[in-house]
Amino acid sequence: MARRSQSSSQGDNPLAPGYLPPHYKEYYRLAVDALTEGGPEAYNRFLASEGAPDFLCPEELEHVSRHLQPPQYVAREPPEGTPSDVDMDGSSGTYWPVNSDQAVPELDLGWPLTFGFQGTEVTTLVQPPPPDSPSIKDEARRMIRSAQQVVAVVMDMFTDVDLLSEVLEAAARRVPVYILLDEMNAQHFLDMADKCRVNLHHVDFLRVRTVAGPTYYCRTGKSFKGHLKEKFLLVDCAVVMSGSYSFMWSFEKIHRSLAHVFQGELVSSFDEEFRILFAQSEPLVPSAGALARMDAYALAPYSGAGPLVGVPGVGAPTPFSFPKRAHLLFPPPREEGLGFPSFLDPDRHFLSAFRREELQRMPGGALEPHTGLRPLARPTEAGPFGELAGPRGFFQSRHLEMDAFKRHSYATPDGAGAVENFAAARQVSRQTFLSHGDDFRFQTSHFQRDQLYQQHYQWDPQFAPARPQGLFEKLRAGRPGFADPDDFALGAGHRFPELGADVHQRLEYVPSSASREVRHGSDPAFGPSPRGLEPSGASRPNLGQRFPCQATLRQGLDTASEAEPERRGGPEGRAGLRHWRLASYLSGCHGDGGEEGLPMEAEACEDEVLAPGGRDLLPSAFRTPAAFPAKGPKPGSGSGGGDSSEREGPEETSLAKQDSFRSRLNPLIQRSSRLRSSLIFASQAEGAVGTAAATTEKVQLMHKEQTVSETLGPSGEAVRSSASAKVAELLEKYKGPARDPGGAGGAVTSSSHSKAVVSQAWREEVVAPGGAGTERRSLESCLLDLRDSFAQQLHQEAERHPGAASLTAAQLLDTLGGTDRLPSRFLSAQGRSLSPQGRDSPPPEGLGTHQLPYSEPKGNPTPAYPERKGSPTPAYPERKGSPTPAYPERKGSPTPAYPERKGSPTQAYPERKGSPTSGFPNRRGSPTTGLMEQKGSPTSTYPDRRGSPVPPVPERRGSPVPPVPERRGSLTFAGESSKTGPTEEVSSGPMEVLRKGSLRLRQLLSPKNERRGEDEGSFPTPQENGQPESPRRPSLSRGDSTEAAAEERGSRVRLASATANALYSSNLRDDTKAILEQISAHGQKHRGVPAPGPAHSSPDVGRPTTAGDLAPDMSDKDKCSAIFRSDSLGTQGRLSRTLPGSAEERDRLLRRMESMRKEKRVYSRFEVFCKKDEAGSSGAGDNLADEDTRDSKMGKFVPKILGTFKSKK
């Protein structure tokens, strides 16, 4: 009995009523074999011998003869001598297909899911149409125009240009269009596109493939295929038009045809049929000539575009590169070089090199791995990321269609196989839809594509998406730039560069820059963050999506910071950055590029200007990485930073990171101005990071080191002898002294840059074990000269304006001491405003000199200040030394602030921040209440700064706290004489505006113009305080050991930290600053203004003043400040009592501010309130609990108070 496989009628009952006898006849097969082997003659002979009728018409005979294909493996055919009926492999191609595991192409543009229908409806259309019925062509056009999800066309012949226009319009609307053409007639379609100058390769939402009829295999292995005679148009999987109508002009005009329009459940059968046909389809193959011309053209869609512009023949006209002349079909204007531009994806050309080209849809069998394949792939081998040999577009898309990849497609490691039937596909689609919900509402789940990625791309698994991605999901997600279906097509190459195997995939957890900094800090020394932000932002919801941007390395702040040093290293760059910062501060600009409102960020930038190494939020001093040492020598690199970093090494870096982390986490980071943020928060951060105790300890340690290695210089300053100690001490000295001189040398802004370079060199020299002594001597001599000139100027000032002169001295000292501490941005401003003082006007020099004595103990200050005088660089360079030279110097230098900063970047930095107010003012003895207020109330720092005409200067100093500006401002203010004038002149632009603004605020705050006099008087008074400071500085430098100076600075640092904390905890606004200034002004007013004048007037301003000396003119607070300056440790003790700690100081400040605000409800009572605040400042600790509440209230009253002041004025 015949086996089932041998009997087509097995199981059929011949006796059944509906039995249909088989029609198969053996002679049919034998006759066809004879035809294929011997031609028509053999065919006729066989029929004659069998006595059978001719069952083939002439057309069929011609078709078979014309399309007969030899066996695929010709080499295996038997030699001519062997019998033709013997198969070399012993099997027939009919039963043993060569490519049984051929991959199934996917519907890469998406396919809508349909689960139910609203009913079934069938409409019959005929051609030519009846009078009242639409024609088949019109109905087809209407259907295509209404498409929203998909247009699927199966046609034997497609040469109607009108219908082609409709299809292209749909594709231009981003409606996926699939066209399946008869393989044998596809050339006609290509010819039509060529005539219309339509480049099918650049219509993203169009897929044209070919389908052949069933293949008939002969016993010899020869075969021939039939035509695709199915004709239907499927729209949105909801409506189908099917019939005998072909998309040809003749069918509209001369042929009779029939078509039906189906809606409802019947559409599902066409849906399934189309999927089956598409799975069996092959890429569209152009003519041999066109293919040859396109070998080098695939990635160069048209002349002048794409990476292969230079490839020979690219510019030659081809069927797919049309001349630039008016379009035949669509008159509307279009883009040059592309036919039907209105139908193209708008961003298609921008990344055409990564687009899937129509050539990719050409049959892999035809192209195979020969000529056309490699030329196309070569251009992409060097992708932007060099990950893969070109975008996945060509190889990955094509390899499914190449014989080399067609085997074993079902034997995937995970056992997953391509979907074999429509039912299974539908089931998977349903499951996917249910699991993903709306994401796949308009998209067929491309489970095939997903599995194919796994199956066929196992060779590069990184390209396998976690879940299918389709056009509609992409579009619905609204991801501009990725809406191109080619990006999702399995066979289509991404228009965008592919991710390399070395690039992390999106599936991996990519920590944000913030989290990275939290874990590792933002120090550039740790290298760039693993991935950038930020351009990509949060990870895409579709983890499976592999867009190059997702894994693109980000140019993080850290990475940029490494380049920053050299880019902005120059003084000009720093000055520019400072100016910009000042401008932003004035304009109320607050968002920093990356770290929104982070105070340290702004400061880091400022410092960065000086020392690019520290790009992060941390001050450059903290951020000084290993790179800094190398860059240290460079003026732009920030010698101070380099030295500090060299000395401190990675330890410092780690500290810097911690500091950055703290500041980043700072909840109060968001401020109204970048400047204010940097000032307040830098000081706050410093205070937070390093406690006053830590600062004091560091200062003491530094002092000890200084004592050990220090020698007295000509100026009386302690000069370090030991190399390492010298380096640290010198740096510290430079920082402290440099700052002091910097404060005086308002010219530091511009010249300070140059000076910074010089001072950096000096510092480096000093750092060098051998040259330190010599450099110190020269610096000392310079300092002495400066001091002398300063004393002379002081005398002159005293004679002209006794109070002003004194004030000037104190202010100069303050300025000199605080310049370096000013934030770099203010340094520039300060330099502009003070340059006249420091450079142009002798008084500034005097100031610088006066301060120099103080700074001399540091040792570095001498060179710094002289440099400043001689060359703008020295004082500033120290700052320059590191983006925050002052910081680095602090670190490197024994000065408590700096060392502390090193020891605890936070303290050091806070010190720096607070120092402008507490530390620096005290040290500086700035006439401005900055000093006194520092002691009395950190608040005064701000008032001073405000009061000072050159508020930017303090900022410039690098210390976020305005106190530095206060000193400068005080200096300029108190010495409204020539100094003030030059300062104002110099501080043009932002600086001028700031200075004027602060003055105006003071005036507003002070109901009487008497306020100004008061301020001037106050300045002298602060000078008294400052003067004692100044003398103490000199005495510290000369009489007192460097230790004293260091301790003094440490205490100042404490004050600064406290002030910073206070300022930080209190959400200071401009109004708050005004209040602080008012408080400081009152404090100054009530302190003995006269005394400071004489002290400063006398050339001996440098001599230390005792608490008793200060007592007469100064309040206890002021005395404390003075004593603090004069007695290093004793001063610290006083400070501790006055400001038991940063917390105490902060509490005091907050208390004063709160009381001020409460009392400021009525402007007329403002002075009284200020007095009360001053009086209550000593007991600030008692009101700590109320500070928060008061602080919260400040915001409410300050605006009103300010408004009142303005209206009254």
Swiss-Prot record:
Tissue/organ expression? Expressed in tooth follicle, eye, liver and kidney.
Q: Where in the cell is it found?
A: Cytoplasm, Cytoskeleton; Cytoplasm
Ranges for region Mediates interaction with CSNK1A1 and is required for FAM83H activity in keratin cytoskeleton organization: 1-286
Q: Where is region (Disordered) located?
A: 512-545, 615-664, 735-760, 829-1056, 1076-1147, 1174-1193
Record-linked Gene3D superfamilies: Endonuclease Chain A (3.30.870.10)
Indicate the principal place this protein occupies in or around the cell.
Answer: cytoplasm
- Tell me the keywords, alphabetical order: Biomineralization, Cytoplasm, Cytoskeleton, Phosphoprotein
InterPro entries attached here? FAM83, PLDc_FAM83H_N, SACK1
Residue positions, PTM Phosphoserine:
512-513, 515, 522, 639, 660, 752, 778, 806, 871, 882, 893, 904, 915, 926, 937, 948, 959, 970, 977, 1035, 1041, 1057, 1080, 1098, 1177
Main function = May play a major role in the structural organization and calcification of developing enamel. May play a role in keratin cytoskeleton disassembly by recruiting CSNK1A1 to keratin filaments. Thereby, it may regulate epithelial cell migration.
Protein name in UniProt: Protein FAM83H
Organism for this UniProt entry: Mus musculus (Mouse)
